[in-house]
Amino acid sequence: MSLIRKKGFYKQDVNKTAWELPKTYVSPTHVGSGAYGSVCSAIDKRSGEKVAIKKLSRPFQSEIFAKRAYRELLLLKHMQHENVIGLLDVFTPASSLRNFYDFYLVMPFMQTDLQKIMGMEFSEEKIQYLVYQMLKGLKYIHSAGVVHRDLKPGNLAVNEDCELKILDFGLARHADAEMTGYVVTRWYRAPEVILSWMHYNQTVDIWSVGCIMAEMLTGKTLFKGKDYLDQLTQILKVTGVPGTEFVQKLNDKAAKSYIQSLPQTPRKDFTQLFPRASPQAADLLEKMLELDVDKRLTAAQALTHPFFEPFRDPEEETEAQQPFDDSLEHEKLTVDEWKQHIYKEIVNFSPIARKDSRRRSGMKL
């Protein structure tokens, strides 16, 4: 392989895996590995900044892997918002399409994620600032026509200045596409996803934000279901068992008859459920943890809630300049065809200066 490596690249083992990097990225250090790839940190010699580099594992193993890799590349490239992870660079050591087997994605480096710091006690001010950033990121993602669908503490990256970026679009889909299969870790998953009981839209992500915010307030997972039914039971204990108006909207007959078989119960009082929460925090949670998707807040609506008044800057609540183009999403292409599309994207990639907010909260984790 060394004979066909591009000039200006060097090879190094990172966590027992061979990485081939441009000489501009030095000191690669293993950060973590997942099902679809591994991540290391490195220093970009040009800027002196620390970056995260992701090497996808076997991106061309099958059509499904190749399509997933293509979608991840395109989504990262499309997202240009300070609260959404975006692409700084993409490269391959291959000198031509013929020897193209691997590629690497370069993103901003974030020190930790919300999952790792969930044990700490969050002040209301910190919760305001972090949840505000989640919603700004979601407003932007949703305006591009994309639903994240896998929002959980583990894919909300934060740095020591409490700046947050939404990560991991591995399972994100275009809002109009048919939504199927295993998506969000069950505990953060909206009830309409768990049961496919009614149409669903971008507010599935708002339900997840509600679950995450509740966990930040109490230090405990809000709905820790052992299985689907237990998850629903725990949700209904908090939201109450809905009445006829809601049941009429359900598409699923089994879900309909199950809900009708339960005694109707009112919603819990959120100020009692979350004694640490201010009245405004409890009110926002109530509006995000709404069973009926037609009544649940959108990201744009949630941002206008008085809870965020201390940090709100409408100029930072931007939308995507254009919708995400997933015209190849439904194409049945071969691995070689996906490979060609990815290679073309890499060759034609030109980095965009990413505008992060210069406004600092002065807050530390």
From Swiss-Prot:
Keywords: ATP-binding, Cell cycle, Kinase, Nucleotide-binding, Phosphoprotein, Serine/threonine-protein kinase, Stress response, Transcription, Transcription regulation, Transferase
Domain of life: Eukaryota
Cofactor(s) of this protein: Mg(2+)
Motif (TXY): 180-182
Active site: 150 (proton acceptor)
Catalytic activity: L-seryl-[protein] + ATP = O-phospho-L-seryl-[protein] + ADP + H(+); L-threonyl-[protein] + ATP = O-phospho-L-threonyl-[protein] + ADP + H(+)
PROSITE patterns (alphabetical): MAPK (PS01351), PROTEIN_KINASE_ATP (PS00107), PROTEIN_KINASE_DOM (PS50011)
Pfam families the record matches: Pkinase
Chain positions found as Phosphotyrosine: 182
Assembly: Interacts with MAPK8IP2.
Family: Belongs to the protein kinase superfamily. CMGC Ser/Thr protein kinase family. MAP kinase subfamily.
Known function: Serine/threonine kinase which acts as an essential component of the MAP kinase signal transduction pathway. MAPK13 is one of the four p38 MAPKs which play an important role in the cascades of cellular responses evoked by extracellular stimuli such as pro-inflammatory cytokines or physical stress leading to direct activation of transcription factors such as ELK1 and ATF2. Accordingly, p38 MAPKs phosphorylate a broad range of proteins and it has been estimated that they may have approximately 200 to 300 substrates each. MAPK13 is one of the less studied p38 MAPK isoforms.
PANTHER family per the UniProt record, alphabetical: MITOGEN-ACTIVATED PROTEIN KINASE
Domain remark from Swiss-Prot or TrEMBL: The TXY motif contains the threonine and tyrosine residues whose phosphorylation activates the MAP kinases.
Protein name (record): Mitogen-activated protein kinase 13
Source organism: Homo sapiens (Human)
Name of the gene: MAPK13
